[in-house]
């Protein structure tokens, strides 16, 4: 045994939320703490082994140990991104250790010098790759008997195999990782039928469990015991209750309860004979059984040939391996059942057995690492028990790239693993691609690593362009694995480019990294010349707006686009091919449900509502009001200008008056301000609401006003010993001091207490005539009335009370920009406190800063495993794009959820077809192309004569250049103008010099005089 195992180190430290922030939102604290107690061993440090190790190290287990004494060879460099030519001959595990250790300082990386039983028993989970079937059985017999998780995985070219065994009894605490469902009850019948309020869907399934709270008339139901659900429909479910539960009066909330589930796994020896498969592609339902025999046949071949696999595309070797598959099928006929062995399909596996494809490695590496995390944390449902996969559609066309023993033999290159599958000519094609990667965050880093292994862009004609205008933050390090702690603050694209050039020196000088955001404002940088040189565009973005823009450019320049995204354990990939598929923008997600205005202002019933209210309060206090003050101080005629645009001018001016006439001069003043605001928001405003709508108020129909989603609030009495009350004061005072540029003393809690004791609070006086909207319709009506009833006299009065800007020359406030990831800036502290105080008003369960940050910061949960997997799938599509496949059935859009686990594929949707005058056109990809800066008359004549179309309207951007209903003189004046002159005359702007294409939209009639939809016009200057 080596002495550096550190297996019995003390219990894990607290979770570093700065580092693991995004992953915590995927796994939760409980699962993370379990992982930090788990020791993991990886046997086999080829490309797949290192990919799994990388993902596990980033995720944060207690320790990660490696075993692979085999010496490094040149072919390892096909996918082993932490090895280089200088390490050839060294043991793989020793050579990989240091680079793995850099990924996460919380995870010690050890090398073990044997894998006897004593060593294996030290681990919670063991992964093996690339070992003999005999060794797998030996290891699994030990792990199964001792309840140690065991995963074996193998990759052969475009094929892959996973086996999972987590022992006789493995408990899954949370099968899906989804937030527990909850809702408001409108009725519970005596037979146990529960009905939802206001046609809200409950989303539950048969067998789910729920608990209840706040049900009036049924105290026994509120005791918190889980009840099993029988679904009656989308708006009702049934639970078992008897007469002892009492009779329903009103109210009630239900919340789903996650019930642990026990799973039982069989050892490898049993599963070899009677396998249980997870299907990865429903179009290949019969393939797992074929591959189950095929992979065993390869082990039989290796046994006969001293561990050697069949040579690439060697017919003799493939025939021998197929013979072993036939013998296995005869020995165990139940595996194939009625089916026959598919010789053509299995020979493809044998031909490719020495292949090592970066895309398959990334896909499987993400998948397997997530299985390890499931074993260590008991969170999410594991694979039972085999998963087979192939991506034969990625093979290039036989006619252009023939695959045979000569073309696919190794050439002593780092790309031999890829050449073994695709051949030398296709490898050259990959090397000479020009590819644009938009974004170098989590997906971008993984993509670049895959491309470095593929040799993409490394040839004489090749080039990789990257752009990202973001810099590296600590929370990125947990999944953007090309970055290290020393890189925090640097530009993502530059650091990523340097990192992959070290992985593959062939990329030196082949990467052009930019810091520019891709958008309309940078079309002079990403111009015609830039776009036309590209072969493929790949998105690695995290927002819809940027994705849509890149998609539009790809459609315009007719460039293939590979798109992907992740959300926690969910991921998707989409391939967009010119003149074949629809584009990214063709389909859209449904819009997010917004919180009704009256719910936000007066009737919250969920913590999400109070967090949204608190974020809005933060923006109002510390961003919008200071910005209004600065505009007033810097803009002449501010009041007159604002009157025209802002219906709530009165509220805006009152705020400016408060911020200038009552400005604080000391930090003590800031504390007093925060205390007064506490009283206003959490006491007086609540008392006013109850004055307008007393607890016993009734609606116009005689029903109780405070029922259903409306919860009657209680005013808060300030309590200095309540953490949320005090945090509101501390956060508020510090933020106010910041906007006024006051020095913030390092005030202690005692300092705050001293000042707070001196604050005099006026008692609440109810105001009559205060309108509070009880419904959204009322809120909308009030907003409309606001814009229609501006009281000039009142506004003049407030405006007159404002100090003259000239008396405050040069004086400005500093508006605060919300930043969620800095725990020292009081932003999240203040929002959490404000949200929790409001939750206390309404009897809603409060949330910690971690949850508040997630909702207020709109954080996208993320984990390295999903990212790796998704980029692997993208690279498998990339091979198809390089080959120029024009059969839509060969392409796959991927949909995965590692938590379930679910892997599904579908064909892309074909681009829609349009028609005019019996001519067909592609509604997405086709356009009318004209050359030269012609006149408007020439353009109209061309369409009349060549296309049989009479143009009735012509527009450029937002400018209408021509319409048949224009006055004759206007039309006459414009017909003789060149298009660029016409644009200048109408829009009052020159066409920028970098613009080489003018895009016009038209409305027109066909030969029958009917209005028809046609493509846009592109005029090349």
Swiss-Prot record:
Gene Ontology CC annotations of this record: cytoplasm; nucleus
Binding site for ATP: 22, 442, 468, 479, 492, 518, 542-543
Residues that coordinate or bind Mg(2+) 1: 470
Superkingdom as given in the UniProt entry: Eukaryota
Chain residues that bind Mg(2+) 2: 542
Pathway stated in the Swiss-Prot or TrEMBL entry: Protein modification; protein ubiquitination
One GO BP: ubiquitin-dependent protein catabolic process
Residue numbers annotated as active site: 598 (glycyl thioester intermediate)
Cellular compartment(s): Cytoplasm; Nucleus
Record keyword Cytoplasm present: yes
Keywords of the record: ATP-binding, Cytoplasm, Ligase, Magnesium, Metal-binding, Nucleotide-binding, Nucleus, Ubl conjugation pathway
GO molecular function: ATP binding; ubiquitin activating enzyme activity
Listed EC numbers: 6.2.1.45
Catalytic activity field: ATP + ubiquitin + [E1 ubiquitin-activating enzyme]-L-cysteine = AMP + diphosphate + S-ubiquitinyl-[E1 ubiquitin-activating enzyme]-L-cysteine
Quaternary data: Monomer.
Note: There are two active sites within the E1 molecule, allowing it to accommodate two ubiquitin moieties at a time, with a new ubiquitin forming an adenylate intermediate as the previous one is transferred to the thiol site.
Family: Belongs to the ubiquitin-activating E1 family.
PANTHER family attached to this UniProt entry: UBIQUITIN-ACTIVATING ENZYME E1, UBIQUITIN-ACTIVATING ENZYME E1 C-TERMINAL DOMAIN-CONTAINING PROTEIN
Biological function: E1 ubiquitin-activating enzyme that catalyzes the first step in ubiquitin conjugation to mark cellular proteins for degradation through the ubiquitin-proteasome system. Activates ubiquitin by first adenylating its C-terminal glycine residue with ATP, and thereafter linking this residue to the side chain of a cysteine residue in E1, yielding a ubiquitin-E1 thioester and free AMP.
Name this polypeptide is given: Ubiquitin-activating enzyme E1 1
Organism listed in the record: Candida albicans (strain WO-1) (Yeast)
């Amino acid at each position: 045994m080596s002495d550096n195992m550190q297996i019995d180190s003390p219990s894990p430290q607290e979770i570093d939320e700065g580092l693991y922030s995004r992953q915590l939102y995927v796994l939760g604290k409980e699962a993370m703490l379990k992982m930090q107690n788990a020791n993991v061993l990886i046997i086999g440090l080829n490309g797949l082994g290192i990919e799994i190790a990388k993902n596990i190290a980033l995720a944060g287990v207690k320790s990660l140990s490696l075993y692979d004494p085999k010496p490094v060879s040149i072919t390892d460099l096909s996918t082993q991104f932490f090895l280089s030519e200088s390490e050839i001959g060294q043991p793989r595990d020793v050579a990989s250790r240091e680079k793995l250790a850099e990924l996460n300082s919380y995870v010690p990386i050890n090398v073990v010098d044997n894998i006897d039983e004593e060593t294996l028993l030290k681990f919670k989970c063991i992964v093996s790759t690339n070992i003999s079937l005999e060794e797998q059985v030996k290891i699994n017999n030990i792990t199964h008997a001792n309840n140690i998780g065991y995963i074996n995985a193998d990759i052969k070219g475009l094929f892959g195999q996973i086996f999972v065994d987590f022992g006789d009894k493995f408990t899954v605490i949370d099968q899906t990782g989804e937030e527990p469902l909850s809702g408001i009850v409108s009725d519970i019948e005596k037979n146990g039928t529960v009905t939802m309020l206001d046609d809200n869907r409950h989303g539950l399934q048969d067998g789910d469990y729920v608990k209840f709270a706040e049900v009036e008339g049924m105290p026994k139901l509120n005791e918190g015991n889980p009840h099993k659900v029988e679904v009656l429909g989308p708006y009702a479910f049934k639970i078992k209750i008897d007469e002892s539960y009492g009779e329903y009066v009103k109210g009630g909330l239900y919340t789903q309860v996650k019930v642990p589930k026990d799973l039982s796994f069989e050892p490898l020896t049993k599963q070899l004979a009677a396998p249980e498969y997870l299907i990865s592609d429903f179009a290949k339902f019969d393939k797992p059984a074929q591959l189950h025999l095929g992979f065993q046949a390869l082990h039989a071949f290796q046994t006969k040939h001293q561990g050697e696999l069949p040579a690439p595309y060697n017919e003799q070797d493939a025939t021998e391996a197929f013979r072993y598959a036939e013998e296995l099928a005869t020995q165990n006929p139940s595996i194939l059942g009625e089916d026959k062995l598919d010789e053509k399909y299995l020979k493809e596996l044998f031909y490719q057995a020495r292949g090592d494809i970066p895309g398959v490695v990334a896909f499987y590496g993400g998948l397997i690492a997530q299985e390890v995390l499931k074993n260590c944390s008991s969170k999410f449902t594991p694979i039972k028990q085999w998963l087979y996969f192939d991506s034969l559609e990625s093979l290039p066309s036989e006619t252009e790239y023939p695959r045979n023993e000569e073309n696919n033999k190794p050439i002593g290159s780092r790309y031999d693993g890829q050449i073994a599958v695709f051949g030398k000519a296709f490898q050259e094609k990959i090397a000479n691609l020009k590819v644009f990667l938009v974004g170098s965050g989590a997906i971008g880093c993984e993509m670049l690593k895959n491309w470095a292994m593929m040799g993409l862009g490394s040839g004489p004609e090749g080039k990789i362009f990257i752009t990202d205008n973001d810099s590296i933050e600590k929370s990125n390090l947990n999944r953007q694995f090309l970055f290290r702690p020393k890189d925090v603050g640097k530009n993502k694209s530059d650091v990523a480019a340097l990192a992959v050039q070290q992985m593959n020196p062939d990329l030196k000088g082949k990467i052009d990294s930019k810091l520019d955001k891709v958008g309309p404002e940078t079309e002079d940088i990403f111009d015609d010349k830039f776009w036309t040189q590209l072969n493929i565009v790949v998105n690695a973005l995290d927002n819809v707006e940027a994705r849509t823009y890149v998609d539009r450019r790809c459609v315009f320049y007719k460039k293939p686009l590979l798109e992907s995204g992740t959300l926690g354990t969910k991921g998707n990939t989409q391939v967009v091919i010119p003149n074949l598929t629809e584009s990214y923008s063709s389909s859209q997600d449904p819009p997010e449900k917004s919180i009704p205005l009256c719910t936000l202002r007066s009737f919250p019933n969920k913590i999400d509502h109070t967090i949204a209210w608190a974020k809005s309060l933060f923006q109002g206090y510390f961003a919008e009001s200071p910005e209004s003050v600065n505009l007033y101080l810097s803009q002449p005629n501010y009041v007159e200008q604002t009157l025209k645009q802002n219906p709530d001018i009165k509220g805006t001016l009152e705020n400016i008056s408060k911020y200038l006439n009552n400005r604080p001069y000391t930090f003590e003043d800031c504390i007093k301000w925060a205390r007064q605001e506490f009283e206003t928001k959490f006491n007086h405003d609540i008392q006013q609401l109850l004055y307008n709508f007393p607890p016993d108020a009734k609606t116009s129909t005689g029903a109780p006003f405070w029922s259903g989603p409306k919860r009657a609030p209680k005013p808060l009495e300030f309590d200095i010993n309540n953490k949320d009350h005090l945090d509101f004061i501390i956060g508020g005072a510090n933020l106010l001091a910041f906007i006024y540029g006051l020095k913030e003393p390092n005030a202690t809690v005692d300092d705050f207490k001293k000042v707070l004791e001196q604050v005099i609070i006026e008692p609440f006086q109810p105001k009559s005539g205060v309108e509070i909207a009880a419904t959204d319709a009322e809120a909308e009506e009030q907003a409309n009335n606001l814009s229609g009833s501006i009281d000039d006299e009142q506004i003049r009065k407030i405006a007159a009370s404002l100090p003259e800007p000239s008396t405050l020359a040069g004086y400005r406030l500093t508006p605060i920009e919300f930043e969620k990831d800095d725990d020292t800036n009081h932003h999240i502290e203040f929002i959490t406190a404000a949200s929790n105080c409001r939750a206390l008003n309404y009897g809603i369960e409060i949330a910690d800063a971690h949850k508040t940050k997630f909702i207020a910061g709109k954080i996208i949960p993320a984990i390295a495993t999903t990212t790796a997997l998704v980029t692997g799938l993208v690279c498998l599509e990339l091979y198809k794009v390089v080959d120029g496949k024009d059969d839509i059935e060969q392409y796959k859009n991927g949909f995965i959820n590692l938590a379930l686990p679910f892997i599904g594929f579908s064909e892309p949707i074909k681009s829609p077809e349009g028609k005019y005058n019996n001519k067909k056109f592609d509604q997405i990809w086709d356009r009318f192309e004209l050359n030269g800066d012609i006149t408007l008359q020439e353009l109209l004549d061309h369409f009349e004569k060549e296309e049989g179309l009479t143009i009735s309207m012509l527009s450029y951007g937002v400018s209408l250049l021509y319409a048949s209903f224009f006055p004759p003189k206007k039309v006459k004046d414009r017909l003789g103008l060149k298009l660029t002159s016409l644009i200048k005359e109408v829009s009052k702007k020159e066409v920028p010099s970098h613009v080489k294409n003018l895009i016009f939209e038209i409305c027109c009639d066909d030969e029958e005089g009917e209005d028809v939809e046609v493509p846009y016009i592109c005029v090349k200057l």
